[in-house]
Amino acid sequence: MVSVELLRVDPLTAARRLLGAVLTCRGVSATVVEVEAYGGPPDGPWPDAAAHSYRGPGPRNQVMFGPAGRLYTYRSHGIHVCANVACADDGVAAAVLLRAAVIESGHDVVQRRRGEAVRESAFARGPGNLCSALGITMADNGIDVFAEDSPVHLRLGEEQPCIAGPRVGVSKAADRPWRLWLAGRPEVSAYRRSPRAPAPGGSD
């Protein structure tokens, strides 16, 4: 089974399969250690009010509707570029946000991109920092991460035991345990609940 076929599944399964994947981009290689799964609109198989695709397809979120293996990029708060990998069957909205990674090679490149004062464990901690470290930009939206000549290339590895918990900073579906991470990794970001989210237990 080729890598992209392993992502033609529900978003949570895809998220598990993306943990431990090796991401290579513009002189840097990194191993993914934290991800978040996102579903789609109310009439889809995985309704998710926190997903950009919840209100249906549009020019900005079209990549979330497939095909699997395409990179969906967006700006968080209009500033930081964040990257997701589309999953599920073509036409069905689902994606996995790449939240954190450990840099395996290209440390000097990352240091220049992130700044001399940034510690190695924080190079790619958080989705905006991950994209900054690897040089992922908005121009990468829609590219095939499994194509050999892709500027952002992904190679899946063996599934690894992981921990699950609520997603960071979402105000809807705030209790859903769709954030996954590898235990013991200092690169994993801290959990912060959105101040707009209901109290714990008051959301799905």
From Swiss-Prot:
CDD domains, A to Z: AAG
One term of GO molecular function: alkylbase DNA N-glycosylase activity
Alphabetical list of InterPro entries matching this protein: Formyl_transferase-like_C_sf, MPG, MPG_sf
Class in the EC hierarchy, top level: hydrolase
The protein's Enzyme Commission number: 3.2.2.-
Biological process according to GO: base-excision repair
Domain of life: Bacteria
KW Hydrolase (keyword) present: yes
Keywords: DNA damage, DNA repair, Hydrolase
Similarity remark: Belongs to the DNA glycosylase MPG family.
Protein name per Swiss-Prot or TrEMBL: Putative 3-methyladenine DNA glycosylase
Species this chain originates from: Mycobacterium sp. (strain KMS)
Phylogenetic placement of the source organism: Bacteria, Bacillati, Actinomycetota, Actinomycetes, Mycobacteriales
